[in-house]
UniProtKB/Swiss-Prot annotation:
GO biological process: autophagy; division septum assembly; fungal-type cell wall organization; polysaccharide catabolic process
Protein's name according to its UniProt entry: Probable secreted beta-glucosidase UTH1
Places the protein is found: Mitochondrion outer membrane; Secreted, Cell wall
Function recorded in the entry: Involved in aging, oxidative stress response, and in the regulation of mitochondrial biogenesis. Inactivation of UTH1 increases life span, leads to higher resistance to heat stress and to hydrogen peroxide, and increases sensitivity to the superoxide radical-generating drug paraquat and to copper. Also required for the selective autophagic degradation of mitochondria (mitophagy) in response to nitrogen starvation. Involved in the remodeling of the cell wall during the various phases of yeast culture development and under various environmental conditions and plays a role in septation.
Natural source organism: Saccharomyces cerevisiae (strain RM11-1a)
């Protein structure tokens, strides 16, 4: 079928949850959620495809990719949240064959809800004031500041990894809930298909920092509060893995795949100041100057640089997506001196058909 006859299928499905209902004795700083709009290119048979593009194979880690991205990713604002339009989308239950971080399997009913399970691969987020948890929420949208009976206690994993725990039954109003379940004062898995708390992503992207300051990259707590609190801190002159969600086997929102989303703060902003739900004009958290997207589906990795409608200011660095040595990437994507490559203000996406690519900050 000719590419001119391809259909652009916009699965515009609101992941916007109603504002969180506050428990009478508890509080939470975030009443806003993200709205995700998934745009995919399909043929007449409904198969997801990407338009033909010149394929560039990098001969070196900093080699340039020549072609224009097959699909672009845009982020537009609403009063309550940001909207992401991406070629990559999100995912369902985790794969038991994937590797995990942590010392052994998680055992239900052995850890008190008052204790954070850091020895099981989860990463404590002490600056949030939630006992290390990324968020604490029940099925009705009530939030709390301590993990307690009837609540799902969501957690972060190390860079390159994602949490495995969320209940298969999700709220009917479109909110998402994730984490370990607290029952009778003990922690239990909400997804018993896996014994580990964290699962490795596709491993097809890294963040490479070539500027003089540390950069706090903040992933969203999803499924869960969708706050941008999951940290990947890239020190000056160093690199860290980016969690590229394996969409075909990860959490799905109402039957639709989901990808990872990251808010990138200016260089020099600490993780404690940057990986939070920010306030208007703060330039941090949901007000960070740029957003990244990452997902893997049907054998292809999609990586995006996305404008944040909350903050039109350029970051204090440039960003480009660069193929690693020997890898094959379709498209070119950069954000340099406040200007996106390609169509201009809508951001850009590349597809990695073999190997991996780097988000390079320079």
């Amino acid at each position: 079928m000719k590419l001119s006859a391809l259909l652009a299928l916009s699965a515009s499905t609101a992941v916007l949850a109603a504002p969180a209902v506050h428990h009478s004795d508890n509080h939470h700083h975030n009443d806003k959620r993200a709205v995700v709009t998934v745009t995919q290119y399909v043929n007449a048979d409904g198969t997801v495809v990407i338009p033909a593009a010149n394929t560039a194979t990098s001969a070196a880690a900093d080699g340039k990719v020549e072609s224009v991205a097959a699909a672009t990713t845009t982020l537009s604002s609403t009063a309550a949240a940001a909207t992401t339009s991406a070629a990559a989308s999100s995912s369902s239950s985790s794969s038991s064959s994937s590797s995990s971080v942590g010392s052994g399997d998680f055992e239900d009913g052995t850890i008190s809800c008052s204790d954070f399970p850091s020895g099981q691969g989860a990463v404590s987020l002490d600056w949030l004031g939630l006992g290390g948890w990324a968020s604490i929420m029940d099925m009705n949208g009530n939030t709390a500041t301590s993990c307690q009976d009837g609540y799902y206690c969501s957690y972060a994993c190390s860079p390159g990894y994602a949490k495995t725990q969320w209940p298969s039954e999700q709220p009917s109003d479109g909110r998402s809930v994730g984490g370990l379940y607290c029952k009778n004062g003990k922690l239990y898995r909400s997804n018993t298909d896996t014994n580990s708390l964290c699962v490795e992503g596709q491993g097809s992207a890294q963040a490479v920092n070539k500027v003089s300051g540390s950069i706090a990259i903040c992933g969203t707590d999803y499924p869960g509060s969708e706050n941008m609190v999951v940290p990947t801190v890239v020190g000056a002159g160093s690199s860290q893995p980016i969690n590229v969600i394996k969409e075909d086997s990860y959490y799905q929102w109402q039957g639709k795949k989901t990808s990872a989303q990251y808010y990138v703060n200016n260089a020099g902003v600490s993780v404690e100041d940057g990986c939070i739900w920010g306030t208007e004009g703060s330039g941090v958290g949901n007000w960070a100057p740029v957003v990244l997207g990452a997902g893997y589906t049907d054998g292809i990795t999609y990586l995006s640089i996305i404008p944040n409608p909350n903050n039109k200011e350029a970051p204090n660095f440039n960003i480009k997506i660069v193929a690693t040595d020997g890898s094959t990437v379709n498209g070119a994507c950069s954000y340099e001196n406040g200007v996106y490559s390609g169509s201009g203000s809508d951001g850009c996406t590349v597809s990695v058909t073999s190997g991996s690519a780097n988000f390079v900050f320079y």
